[in-house]
């Protein structure tokens, strides 16, 4: 039987994969993907713990995170499209070209 430890290990591994993607990548789109992987790893952990302690708070919090992540993707992809139209690149290094 798959227990709480298995879910938490998978959650931790997914979070580490997302964190490694955030630290290694220079592409904005891949940074968004890494962020989504990290958020989904947190959701798996919340849902596993809430199922283990028989409390729905973790599941409700995971649903809230999914809603926030959806709005983040909508706004973020719009900004990425504008970024690509202006700089013809999705590299973070072109961020230095912005003046404000």
Swiss-Prot record:
GO terms for cellular component: NADH dehydrogenase complex; plasma membrane. It is an enzyme of class 7 (translocase). One of its GO terms (biological process) is ATP synthesis coupled electron transport. It is found in: Cell inner membrane. It is a multi-pass membrane protein. Its main location: membrane. GO terms for molecular function: NADH:ubiquinone reductase (non-electrogenic) activity; quinone binding. The chain crosses the membrane at residues 1-21, 28-48, 64-84. The keyword Membrane applies. It catalyses: a quinone + NADH + 5 H(+)(in) = a quinol + NAD(+) + 4 H(+)(out). The keyword Nucleotide-binding does not apply. Its EC number is 7.1.1.-. Keywords: Cell inner membrane, Cell membrane, Membrane, NAD, Quinone, Translocase, Transmembrane, Transmembrane helix, Transport, Ubiquinone. NDH-1 is composed of 14 different subunits. Subunits NuoA, H, J, K, L, M, N constitute the membrane sector of the complex. Belongs to the complex I subunit 4L family. NCBIfam families: PRK05715.1-2 (NF004320), PRK05715.1-3 (NF004321), PRK05715.1-5 (NF004323). NDH-1 shuttles electrons from NADH, via FMN and iron-sulfur (Fe-S) centers, to quinones in the respiratory chain. The immediate electron acceptor for the enzyme in this species is believed to be ubiquinone. Couples the redox reaction to proton translocation (for every two electrons transferred, four hydrogen ions are translocated across the cytoplasmic membrane), and thus conserves the redox energy in a proton gradient. This is NADH-quinone oxidoreductase subunit K. The gene is nuoK.
């Amino acid at each position: 039987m798959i227990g709480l430890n298995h879910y938490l290990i998978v959650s931790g591994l997914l979070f580490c994969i997302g964190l490694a993607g955030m630290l290694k990548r220079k592409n904005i789109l891949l940074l968004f993907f890494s962020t989504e992987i990290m958020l989904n790893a947190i959701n798996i952990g919340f849902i596993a713990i809430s199922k283990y302690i028989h409390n729905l708070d973790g599941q409700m919090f995971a649903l809230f995170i999914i809603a926030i992540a959806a709005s983040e993707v909508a706004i973020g992809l719009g900004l990425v499209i504008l970024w690509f139209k202006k700089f013809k690149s999705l590299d973070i290094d072109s961020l230095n070209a912005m003046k404000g």
